[in-house]
C-alpha cells in the first residue's frame, strides 16, 4: 500500500476531524470529514451521520436539554455529560492519564488512539483509513513531515490507501 504522511492542522478555515485531551463538542458542534459528521446535537445525543443518515448514536437524547458536552478526557475516556455535569454515556476506554486523540476517519469510523482503545465499529471495508501514531518523531520508521505537538508528544496522522 502507498501511504502519505499528513499533519493535523488546527485551523478555523478547515473542518476539524480530531479532538485531543480535554477538547470537546458542545451542543451543535461537530467533527467533519468528507460526507461524515460526528455531532453533539442540541438534544444531548451524540450522533455519527453519513450525509443525513444516522449511522451510530450514544442514545442520550433528551428533548430540550441544550447544554450537554462530549469530552475527550486525558484518561482516554470519551464522555457525554448532561447539562448538570453528570456522565450519561462513556466509551469505557479509560486507560490512565496519557495523550489521546479521537479521530473521525474517512472510513466512517470514530476511533480513540493512544493505542486503538475504542471505536464506533462503523468501519467500511476497502476505504482508506487514518492511523495515528506518536513515536518520537517517526511513523513506522519514516520521518514525520511537519509534526504537531500535543502535550509535549509528537503526533502524526498517516493516511492509508485502500486495499485493492
Swiss-Prot record:
Name of the protein: Lectin
The protein's assembly and partners: Homotetramer.
Functional note: Mannose-specific lectin. Induces a Th1-type immune response in vitro. Causes a 4-fold increase in the proliferation of murine thymocytes and a significant increase in the production of nitric oxide at 24 hours in a macrophage cell line. Stimulates the production of the pro-inflammatory cytokines TNF and IL12 by rat peritoneal macrophages in a dose-dependent manner and of the cytokines IFNG and IL2 in murine thymocytes. Has hemagglutination activity towards rabbit erythrocytes.
Gene Ontology molecular function, alphabetical: carbohydrate binding
GO BP terms in the entry: response to other organism
SUPFAM superfamilies assigned: alpha-D-mannose-specific plant lectins
Taxonomic lineage of the native organism: Eukaryota, Viridiplantae, Streptophyta, Embryophyta, Tracheophyta
InterPro entries assigned to the protein according to its UniProt record, in alphabetical order: Bulb-type_lectin_dom, Bulb-type_lectin_dom_sf
Keyword Membrane: no
Residues of the Bulb-type lectin domain: 16-125
PROSITE patterns (UniProt xref): BULB_LECTIN (PS50927)
Key words of the record: Disulfide bond, Hemagglutinin, Lectin, Signal
Signal peptide segment: 1-15
Modification after translation, per record: Not glycosylated.
Record-annotated disulphide pairs: 44-68
Amino acid at each position: 500500500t502507498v501511504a502519505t504522511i499528513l499533519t493535523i492542522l488546527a485551523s478555523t478555515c478547515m473542518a476539524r476531524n480530531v479532538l485531543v485531551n480535554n477538547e470537546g463538542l458542545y451542543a451543535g458542534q461537530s467533527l467533519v470529514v468528507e460526507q461524515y459528521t460526528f455531532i453533539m446535537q442540541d438534544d444531548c445525543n451524540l450522533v455519527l451521520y453519513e450525509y443525513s443518515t444516522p449511522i451510530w448514536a450514544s442514545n442520550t437524547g433528551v428533548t430540550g436539554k441544550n447544554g450537554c458536552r462530549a469530552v475527550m478526557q486525558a484518561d482516554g475516556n470519551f464522555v457525554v455529560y448532561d447539562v448538570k455535569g453528570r456522565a450519561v454515556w462513556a466509551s469505557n476506554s479509560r486507560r490512565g492519564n496519557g495523550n489521546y486523540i479521537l479521530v473521525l476517519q474517512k472510513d466512517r469510523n470514530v476511533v480513540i488512539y493512544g493505542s486503538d482503545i475504542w471505536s464506533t465499529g462503523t468501519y467500511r471495508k476497502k476505504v482508506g483509513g487514518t492511523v495515528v501514531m506518536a513515536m518520537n518523531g517517526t511513523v513506522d520508521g519514516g520521518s514525520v513531515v511537519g509534526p504537531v505537538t500535543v502535550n509535549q508528544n509528537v503526533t502524526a496522522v498517516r493516511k492509508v490507501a485502500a486495499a485493492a
